[in-house]
UniProtKB/Swiss-Prot annotation:
Cellular component aspect of the GO annotation: ribonucleoprotein complex; ribosome
Keyword terms of this UniProt record: Ribonucleoprotein, Ribosomal protein, RNA-binding, rRNA-binding
Single GO MF annotation: rRNA binding
InterPro entries for the chain: Ribosomal_uS11, Ribosomal_uS11_bac-type, Ribosomal_uS11_CS, Ribosomal_uS11_sf
Family under the similarity heading: Belongs to the universal ribosomal protein uS11 family.
The protein, known as: Small ribosomal subunit protein uS11
Species this protein is from: Cereibacter sphaeroides (strain ATCC 17025 / ATH 2.4.3) (Rhodobacter sphaeroides)
Length: 129
């Protein structure tokens, strides 16, 4: 029996000039999602997808590389200006911001959208190293 030829859907080139960069920086990893203003994803990258493993994912350099990769993919779709939403306490926040600016994207605003508990759940116990 002959196999049916499956057609791969080609990525169409969207022409989106403005968007939002969501930088999610945890203690273990940094994820960058660039979406349009409505929230539809255009490009994304993370320290893990850039080839960093283990504790190297949480470094500022890994966040910088991930941000450069996401910005390059977004610029292929015509992205020029972005708003940045930063979430989380990780070490990759600042370096991801700098990398997005250095990649040629015009940053119009920076918002910190880290959720703050109003005395919610009990935090994890202190580490004893």
């Amino acid at each position: 029996m002959a196999r049916d030829k499956t057609r791969m859907k080609r990525k169409e080139r969207k022409n989106i000039a403005a968007g939002v960069a969501h930088v999610n920086s945890s203690f273990n990893n940094t994820k960058i999602l660039i979406s349009d203003v409505q929230g539809n994803a255009i490009s994304w990258s993370s320290a893990g997808t850039m080839g960093f493993k283990g504790s190297r994912k949480s470094t500022p350099y890994a966040a910088q590389m991930a941000a450069e990769d996401a910005a390059k993919k977004a610029q292929e779709h015509g992205m020029k200006t972005i708003e940045v939403e930063v979430q989380g306490p990780g070490s990759g926040r600042e370096s991801a911001l700098r990398a997005l600016a250095a990649a040629g994207l015009n940053i119009t605003s920076i918002r910190d959208v880290t959720p703050m508990a109003h005395n919610g759940c009990r935090p994890p116990k202190r580490r004893r190293v």
